[in-house]
Amino acid sequence: MKKGIALLAAGMMLCGAAASADVLDYLKPIWLQVIDSGSNASEKQIPESVAVICADERMTVEASGVLLENDYAAEAHVYAVLRNNSRERLPIYSVQMTALDAAGKKLHEESYVSHLPDVVEPGETMLASEWMYDFVKDVSKVASIRISIETNSRVNEKWIRNEDVQAWVEGKYLCVKFTNTTDATIFGVVCGATVSDADGQILDMLLQSEYETDDLGIEPGSSVIWRKELEDTAMLKLNTDAVCEAWAYQIESL
């Protein structure tokens, strides 16, 4: 009888200890609970590679990068360079990115993804960049990113690529430099740049909006440098063998 009472008391003490631990955890400040939950989530394996595909048969993905992290919240930086394989000029209305699991189930979707240029000529490329965040508790479920493109029916401008541009990494910044090699002042130059690792995975991307440079005149022989602070996920993977590529466009009305 005494032995049974002792076992019962021990069981009650264990239950009490467990309950006390739960209560103490519940009484933690909310920010500390978030950190604890993030630490547990980050222990789950993050995919080393995620496929990036294009749902539009007119374009194919030439290069991409998906940098996942789950320290305090599930998020992803997604970058892609797509080529227009059709024979038609593509005026881009919007670009969407959808995160899918291995079964093709949608985990998250982002509309109106940043892209450059707004009109993609046949054989030319388009850059796309998006920051996805808080889209799934377990980023290990992400198997692929699907890119969808919606185009306009009319084209009222032409984006002409200019080769007088270069990109490089300086410290924690991705830099892009455009030089006006013509005899006239140039207005409205729009630039973009990527930095990739030795395997071709894009680690970060710089994209300008045409509204940023619409009123900026670059005189003959002058240069302008823009820069973007690299994301933390890019800095962790950046090595001396990084490769940079730059794009520059001038917009002409049709």
What are these regions (language model features)?
Residues 6-14:
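Hydrophobic helical h-region of N-terminal Sec-dependent signal peptides
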Residues 7, 18-175, 179-190, 196-254:
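Membrane engagement elements in two modes
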